[in-house]
């Protein structure tokens, strides 16, 4: 009778560990050019210094390798099922991170401060949660003005530029919010920048805060995002 060997977690380590930090893949993120996968935070930090894949050395992108990254949710779920307690550990660490940086929704940013809802609508009492159970972040949306820039006359500053929203909100959603608030056509193209760098539409506020803004130091709060009419460099 054939015997069946019970597989151990270590049998799969080569597929579920990050070659940069040597730990289990956290938010596994694949490089689309070569499909090598790393922890999201590891590969983002690597691309701050290099535009080559740390595994095979292929040039990922000449100017912005971050655009060539894709989160692998399927692999993430597989890893969580293979490694007992990993999901709970990561959720706890993430919660502690946001608590430490005072980004959880636990009060106003300043005396009697008023914040706009990212939905751009008043609460109608219908029970929509707008991700209110998520960790929250306060941001400042500032209009970036360049003298003589085309389209500047219709892109104004917001009356209430401080808002609080979920850390999972993407730049694409921020752009839609700005179009609503500024009464711009839904097809109007805007650039959203952090520290002078244009952010991709799929970047979340959490991602931007961790990889771009927190370099300013703990005292730099809230996070400032600037917007302007889109500039076509082509």
Curated annotation (Swiss-Prot):
Protein name: Polycomb group RING finger protein 5-A
Protein's UniProt keywords contain Nucleus: yes
Keyword vocabulary terms for this entry: Metal-binding, Nucleus, Repressor, Transcription, Transcription regulation, Zinc, Zinc-finger
UniProt zinc finger (RING-type) residues: 18-57
Single GO molecular function: zinc ion binding
GO biological process terms on file: nervous system development; regulation of transcription by RNA polymerase II
Provenance organism: Danio rerio (Zebrafish)
CDD domains: RAWUL_PCGF5 (cd17084), RING-HC_PCGF5 (cd16737)
Oligomeric form and interacting partners: Component of a PRC1-like complex.
A GO-annotated cellular component: PRC1 complex
Record bears the keyword Zinc-finger: yes
Function, as annotated: Component of Polycomb group (PcG) multiprotein complexes; the complex class is required to maintain the transcriptionally repressive state of some genes.
Subcellular location: Nucleus
Region annotation (Disordered) ranges: 97-130
